[in-house]
Amino acid sequence: MRKKVLSLILLWAALLALALIYTDRDEYTWRYEGDELAQIVIPREEADARQKQADEAMALTQQAAQARTDAGLWGSENEWEDDFLPTQGENGGLNLMWGDYQATIEYEDAARMDAHVVSAGYQAFIENGDAHDEAEAENVLLHRLSFVFRLTDSTPNLYLASENSEAIRAVTVHKVGAGVLSADLCAYAALVGAVLTALLVLSWDQTERGRKNRRDMAVVLCAAAFACMPLLWRGVYDGHDLFFHLNRIEGIANGLRNGQFPVRIHSSTLLGYGYAAPEFYPELFLYIPALLRNLGVSLCACVRVFEACIHLATAVSCYLCVRGMMNSRRVAVGASVLYTLCIYRLVNVYTRATLGESLAMVFFPVVMLGLYEVLRRDEKKWPLLALGMTGVCMSHLLSTMFCVLFCAIAALASAGKLLARKRRILAVLAAAGVTALCALWFFVPMMQYTADGISTSVVLNSSEYVHRPGSFLVGFAGDVKADAPEDFAYTIGVVPGLALLIGCALLLARRYAAGRAEMKTENDRLALGLLALGALALLLSTDFFPWRTLCSIRKPFSTFFMQIQFPWRFVGMAVPMLSAAAAWGYLREEKDAKTGMAALIALCVVFSGYTMQTMVQRAPELEKETYTDTRIGQFEYTYPCTEKTALKVGDVRTSQPGVCSVLSYEKRGTELTATVQLEGEAAYIELPLLYYPGYRAEIDGQAQTVARGTNNMVRVYGLSSGESGTVHVWYQPPTAWLIAQAASALGALLLAASLRRMRRRA
């Protein structure tokens, strides 16, 4: 035992040593000298002029936004040109993410040196950005002024302004703590270490069972590693929803740093105004990259590690679940390879960048196994169904709806067994009850905010996003940037993949050749049943289903179908079922198992490899030091008529313009404190926070009324004219939410206890 523990210690020590050795000592360090100084240092007068120009431009933008709202054109211009920016701007300045930075200025003899960290339009995000130095020593070639400033949120176009800019000879900006031990390398090492630890532990079992486990895991992990190929390039490639999910990760990280748990408002999103995405989009699993982010890992590395974890979890989940269903190791390995390297799943992860749907696909096999146990085999294993449905529910809402639909179809197909054994019905109800209890902490806020009138979803014409049956034969990805409805569906490879479809064809061929008499085993019936359900899911993604008719009927009946947005999402439901069926088609006969496995792996590698290769034939959008904007363009999850282009950083306003002076201002997450002086009469004060139910306010310790204001900003009543006062605003979740959280915690404990009892019984 000592040798085993020592081997683990040596493994992790070696990984830590590698991270230390390969840490770039100059990471997050930018130095300017000579002609480069013009890119970071500007005179104080120029900084003031830029700020004035930014204020004037924002005033015009706000006027235009109000005009659009008055004309009923709300939300028509919520797009920005640059979601991602390089750290060093092409025209000068630094684009930096949040954090503490040290600025060091080297200057020649001057009686006094001053430095001010400035960013036109973003000044409210800079703390401790002013520094002064009195030159004491004489006959010194260069004096040095060093100070630490903080960026509370991501800040672009950052410069150093000075009254004596001509005396500056060099400037160095360095992120505090960087260059000692790279957090990114530590995150990568932790992921590799976890995989190697699992393999090392498996190697300790020298029995025949242990040998088989090692063989299976080697193939499964190789499939997951191959799916990670695009992550091995130098950055993260832009996907359709990548920017939205990056802001979710940053929002959770910001909330955790400022004391929110669970995070109910993404306080960093929309220039710090806040965004209630957590009430409408499940994000339990995004706490993993958010925690990494708060440990100093770059956003790029967080996404890479998280997507690699998704691939690993998907491969292992499918292997374990298919093995549990069919009691066959080789079929489980084959299904795992097919599922992990399925073109649709890879497109979900990389091209569409739908982290929610990709996470849901981790749990689809668990739902499949749990449902099979409850309906056909051992209803006492209902906790598996509850676990799978809870995982899907905490990943993606539409996927949850699809799972419920197919569970209902499977239940109808097994109605005879359900009615013959009433305990199966009780097991289904138990799984549904535990799932609902675990998800209560999410659904209660969602229902409350939806009832309050907050926009919840983008409604699209689903009939425009359907497949033609021939598109399922597309084996290679084409234009990875395709965006038009049909172009994306047909050229991007949103299809199961030929490797999977060939396996299904082999299953049907075996069935036809053998005849009914030779296909009577339980696995035969299961594979054919999964094939039928998978084919139904594929049918729902095509124009054979009357999407056009259903989307054209009178509202609100059509709204349900239009909110599905993309019917080809049903391919995601088909893939786990078809993977198991196809694996049985390839590997049913033991005498042909080696040939079948070789063909299966070869087809998967060729088709998925080419697909992933096309994905990386462009420059990555997100790299280690890339600046990521927080102004998302989605229209949902805010009150109607919220013009996101009109949101101004640190905007404090009153009912009468020009009568308010801000004496001090501090914002920490969803908590904001400002001391203001009123020079005239004002009925209210508005603060740079988007209003959501739950905000509370005090002025000098006295509770005040909070309401929706201009552009749905937080409006506080209670300031008296001619007086100064300290306004304190914070977000407080309703009591009903806290009760729901407690109920969900109880549900999670109940689920864990049920799984443990099930395992002990097994």
List each language-model region with its residue ranges.
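Extended, low-complexity, turn-rich repeat/linker tracts enriched in Gly/Pro/Ser/Thr and Asp/Glu
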Residues: E108-S119, N164-A167, P693-G694
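Membrane-embedded transmembrane-helix bundle of lipid-linked glycan/lipid transferases
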Residues: R2-E27, A178-P620, V729-A762
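Extracellular beta-strand elements of beta-rich domains used
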Residues: V171-V173, V727
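Short beta-strand-plus-loop segments that form exposed binding edges in beta-rich domains
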Residues: L158-E166, P733
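Extracellular carbohydrate recognition and processing domains
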Residues: G34-Q53, T69-G72, N78, F84-P86, ...
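Active-site-proximal, structured, solvent-exposed surfaces of multi-pass membrane proteins
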Residues: L647-A762
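Beta-strand-rich ligand-recognition modules
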Residues: P86-D100, R112, A120, N128-T155, ...
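Membrane-interface segments at or immediately adjacent to transmembrane helices
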Residues: D35-A64, D70, W74-G75, Q617-E671
